[in-house]
Amino acid sequence: MTEDTKIGGASGRFPATHWSAVLAARSDDPAERSRALEAIAAAYWKPIYKYVRIRWGKSNEDAKDLTQDFFAKLFEKEYLDDFDPAKARLRTFLRICADRFVANEAKAAKRLKRGGGATHASLDFDAAENELQRADHDMQLAASSESMDDFLEKEFIRSLFGIAVDKLRSECESRGKLIHFRLFEIYDLEADGARKTSYAELAKEFQIAPTDVTNHLAFARREFRRIALDCLREMTASEDEFRREARALLGVVPE
């Protein structure tokens, strides 16, 4: 994305959000806990799948099984009961748990059946594998824990942005503003390594005024920033953690 479409935008203002999936995942309310675990699985299944492929050198099919089985444990409320947000970030905790899980599964003779109630989240493993291959990672890399933390962080950001893009598309469509999303998609998401389409060219393609291109893109960028920050807020346990993560991951400076 170009400089003016960074997640912080011109002001880097924070949205007013109140719900944390990290905290709700340990709720006594089954519906609240299920909602939280769905959100965590949606944000982290793809990073964990890629992590298992690279860190443990697992095949595509084995990584699918392990990822679904791992998140089944989260839905059974076994792992997150031990998570202390004051001591570690969620992704670090999940990485450690995933390492233990894969190591234990390697020793176990019994494998949980794939898809056996592991999660209701939609897991598009083919898309995840395609992303992994395009990134050209060294599948034989014997990476250190520190470098794997960095890898997981980058994949979490990628996953969060993907979720935000999907939500923006859905919101724009429901509000009759799909053209706003299409302009954002073409100008900000599809221009890597290619000549960027000009505002005048977009105006001609969509048969609108150049000023409308400017206004529609400003709307889409603002909404994308809001949605991405909302998604990040759900994955943190406190306002302080949210603000730290926003600065570190998204380049947002709180006012």
Role assignments for model-derived ranges:
Residues 1-255:
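Intrinsic, short, N-terminal disordered tails of RNA polymerase sigma-factor systems
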